Amino acid sequence: MFMKKIVKALALGAMLIAVVILPFTACSNTPVAAGFALPHYNGMSDDGLYDAGNFYLNELRTVGADPGAIYCSVEDITDSFNKSKATALAMNPSLTEEKWEEENGDLNYWIDEYANAFYMIVTSFTGSVSNEVKSEYESVQGAYKLYKSYDLTDWDIAGRIDGYAINVRSDAWSNGTYWAPEFIRDPVSGRYFIFASAQSKNGNASTEYFPGTGTYYNMLYGIIAMSDNPIGPYELVSNEEYYATIAAYDENGEMVVNENNEVIGLDGSVITTVDDNGNILNKNGNIVTHNTPPMNFGLYVDQIKELYPFSDLSPGQTHQTAVWPCIDFNPVIMDNGDMYVYFSQHVSDINAGNHIWGIKMKDMITPDYSTLTFLASPNYSIEKYTPEEVASLSESQIKQDFFAFGNGEKTTYEFGGYYYKKIPTEMSEGSINEGTEVIQHGDKYYLTYSPYGYGNRAYAVRQAVGDSPLGPFTKLGAKYNPVMGINATNDYMAGTGHHCFIKAGDELFILYHAFYNPIENSPNGTFLGRAIGADRAQFMYNEELGYDILYGNGPTYSLQPLPDVASGMTNVAKKAKIKVSGDENTAKYLNDGLFTVQDFTLPWEYVDANEDQKGTTITLTWDTPVEIKSFIIYNSQNYFYAFDKVDLVRFKLAEKPAWYNLKDYNDYCYIENLECNPENVEENDFFMRQGGGALASFDNIKVTEMTIYINSKYTTEAEELDGSLNYAIRVSDIFVMGKEVK
């Protein structure tokens, strides 16, 4: 199903020409309509249009894979503007603010151009650029197509290198296979960074990357690029360019360097050093230029050099850099300001499988190679043991229970001072763990990743949980996974993996790629490609585990509320007091912000619990009036509990709507017989397409109460077959888009 958008407001109030005002009566246990019938849009149309002022849809219109994304607020952009300008003025004392703003734009321009927007980059590159770009930026390649959006649905190409983010110059070490980029903003410098992987050029004895030998993915290294703003163009990092953004300057515009050859930062601390030739070094004492991969484990980790030497790939030849390709770099700044990078060691001609590793950073471009840690492997969690802790184990026990590193005679079971024990997972994962994203929540760290490989329908987002940034992480089982992925009946979205997290305001989103064809995306052996989708996610306390787990509201192919930052409103149902006619113990699930998708989430639904099946009543009340414009009443995850319509939604109004132009008015309005979209159910095979329900949007009204009455199901067949079971109506969640009235 492909749906187009309505590009203008619905102006529903104007449709109110003549109405019958129904009196309010409270003498019945069953709610009745009162006041005027509220003109509304119900989420369905014959021409495929929908209300884009309230909802978004994962239309899969934007081609892309392995997305990385960021949301930029006014505060972010203002900080970046101020710091970029301050650095430029400090480096060039003769430069005036007026001149800098003439060339780069003033604060209002930056806010208009960059703020309140989402930015996304995807796996891609162009081998050539236009003459215009080549002339302006001295560019030879563009890497990672860059998009901009205000609603996570309409993505416009925005990269300044013919639509791409990174300006690859002739002196670059990279030459193609630009995979899996991610954004991060440095709060210290205000700059924007891209972390990703790329294939190197054909190296030689003098380069930090080896000659092209064997399969192309032997030559994958970590890439870091930097820009003053989110659109770019981004340039490959060098020590000189990065440290220039955080250094202090004297009155002559020179970096402040003390007598010990230490570079001083803006806060007076030492940020790095220079060598006797005046070269700026990174915090490891290494020179990083456009021609040196900034994250090069095969060069700077001695144990990797011993275990995976270039001679294993090309017998009889040697090179200073070992064969240890890496992809899917995920940079994360934790709550305490420490930065870590997570990635997958990629399969090579001398190593099998994709395995997850992590490393702490000394600053934005300097890995602390001594902290390199093995975190996860396909089909296994990992536990770390010191040599002393395994001293009592036999050699055969170690070989059986612990991971081996290296090849042939070079095999070892100790890496970086630890032995890594295999803990089999409940769920199979194929030979791949990739697309790693780590997010901190309280005192827990959630390592999320995708198994199997991108061509599998079950490619999804799964989670593992740890107590420290570098683990160990315990992979959770089928009772808590996937976070975002197919269930047993899903026929509408598949392959929903290699994700990223986006924090926008108070909301968390998961952006992922998905199959064009959720059932068979490789007809006749030809892979159809992937496109971009996005859904909400949040944390939910799990009593069995004793801590919060990550849960995704999706994947969806149904209308969903716009992000708060796009609508200017939020889910005010979360602030409502709720009274129900059914099971009060399950009423808490009506406004927890989570609708149910996976089979294990079925208990997280409100249950009517009326044995006589006379319907259920739900009442939301607010102590302070709220101004609302739309709602979704989410259906049950399970067909046999699902409703096919909402019989009544009645609002108690806080004031007469400004658009209401009739004299008769009695403080109420209502919507009757609000049907669920039939595209969200498969009645022949008895399953739901999750994320659907009954929805409506309308011109703004201010309310203090919302009463919902449901008394109609898709089927009563289950009750008829087995009268001993209670198949009462269930409701998964209620989302009411609105804001408090000041």
What are the residue ranges of the model-derived segments?
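Aromatic, loop-rich ligand-recognition surfaces of beta-strand-rich domains
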Residues: 599-663, 690-742
